[in-house]
Amino acid sequence: MNRFFNRELSWLAFNTRVLNEAKDESLPLLERLKFLAIYDTNLDEFYMIRVAGLKQLYEHKIASKGIDGASPEEQLEKIKHYLAHEIEERELEFQKIQALLFKKGLCITPYNELNLEQKAKAKAYFKEQLYALVLPFKLDSSHTFPPLANLTFALFARIKDKETQITSYALIKLPSFIFRFVELEKGLFVLAEEIVEAHLEELFLEHEILDCMAFRVTCDADIAITEDEAHDYADLMSKSLRKRNQGEIVRLQTQKGSQELLKTLLASLRSFQTHSYKKHKLTGMHIYKSAIMLNLGDLWELVNHSDFKALKSPNFTPKIHPHFNENDLFKSIEKQDLLLFHPYESFEPVIDLIEQAASDPTTLSIKMTLYRVGKHSPIVKALIEAASKIQVSVLVELKARFDEESNLHWAKALERAGALVVYGVFKLKVHAKMLVITKKTDNQLRHFTHLSTGNYNPLSAKIYTDVSFFSAKNEIANDIIKLFHSLLTSSATSNALETLFMAPKQIKPKIIELIQNEMNHKQEGYITLKANALVDSEIIEWLYQASQKGVKIDLIIRGICCLKPQVKGLSENIRVYSIVGKYLEHARIYYFKHENIYFSSADLMPRNLERRVELLIPATNPKIANKLLRILEIQLKDTLKRYELNSKGRYTKVSNPNDPLNSQDYFEKQALKTF
């Protein structure tokens, strides 16, 4: 018997749970639409990275197998088979929601159903807003098929010269920055590509439009960097980013159009060349023909529309923890260690702490890691302001996938302001979220530390659940300062920490030690692990052994889980759950009954435990430990948003009509109370 679930199929099962939220009829309509948008965006990234990686392994005949022993070719086929039916489910769900929205006054209307007055408005919009932005190409001997960047959205048409009657083909590129949903009247929306299609004869004068279809390509978007050869890492990353849009096509999505048109499009894609003059290889490319609009990720335009707030869940306002109501946050932290649970408790104290440090004349230095901070960051702006007055040292991780460009921008801005900027660590990704502020008061140095499971990003802090820890304890600050010095000298793996635990050197051995300790207690042992993913085979094997010793184990794994629970003789004492709701579960909390409870930036994956700089923090303060434990206890009682994984790999909703509990709703209501 295979002891592990396939990683890729387990991720797809997570995205299925996202799709299930779109099917939840108890949710407001735009909330359901939001989950369709998330589903599609997730799938885009899955193809850009995971499928692209498998395709590379297959085409280069690299004998690399998944944790379950499946070859790249087998995994590609399993992915295609898994999605074949689910893509249809997604289309049906969109059509259902679209019909319900129509009754509420939000109409996504096909162009051919518009009346004459509405078509006149569409024509005016085309001339004023679209004509100058679309890029039409007639494909002939002097105009070959142009390169297509990743996530290109375009129209492909068959056209006929009215004078010569010669038939040819045309490509019309639509820029990504245009509004996809054009509101012609209040509540009446038409897709931009349908407006363009209706006016193609204004782009191709003296031609008749015979056939047309929309299509979209997804390309390999992973960045391969040879760090050994990097003399200027920022410059190397900048050059690598320019190559991202030139990857091989891994997926083609098409809308309506004849089979003949599709065949011609495929032939054109096979023949055109990229900027590097390497032909695209379309072998194994996944092709999906859609009955609905392409790219449901653009539904965010409607979800965020200000006129339809009644069709969304009410916005929750995170509460300010009472200990942070004082003007001087540093005094609050000196009094006691504090733990916030975002987004239920506000992220504002984190921003305020950095802003206060930047403007406080007693501040001597700020040391901080930045992983994903977003495009408009008040935190980075405060660091830039501080850099002209005090010592600011920032490690900006340029390898944070899909945030590389934003991080590069902020790193350059910090450098210009006078901050010391380090662009990551050689062959490691710095994923630990840490901040230490050093002040001088009463002729003494005082250190204030912030550690988190989530990013220093105010926007994601409103939609991700994370825990955020503040301390003025010297032993914690000393460990963080020691780690910063290691990072600045590129010796991140050389020194072990004393109070905290770091990857790649300490976390995995510590977790194994903690599992072994519970094994010594046999049936009295108990473990709860809450993480985003469980993939590491060594950790899984130790959990299997613990189960066989009688240790009861509850796993709350939001996404990928390669462990097989409830298998007789292997894992019958292990239960695996997943919670998918309005917020993205992101906190990692690890509880061992006979030892302690910990929180961490690290998931239980080889990349986190072996190839990243991560932190595992013990909750030595009883109040904080109890708060973390209460989070786990409530989530294990969730009967509305919790799924259970069985030994066959299927997830089913946990329900109890007599005791309905949505853990995320509970935490909203109980914010600032003792959970």
Predicted features, each with a name:
Residues 1-527, 545-549, 561-675:
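N-terminal localization/anchoring segments of enzymes in phospholipid and broader phosphate metabolism
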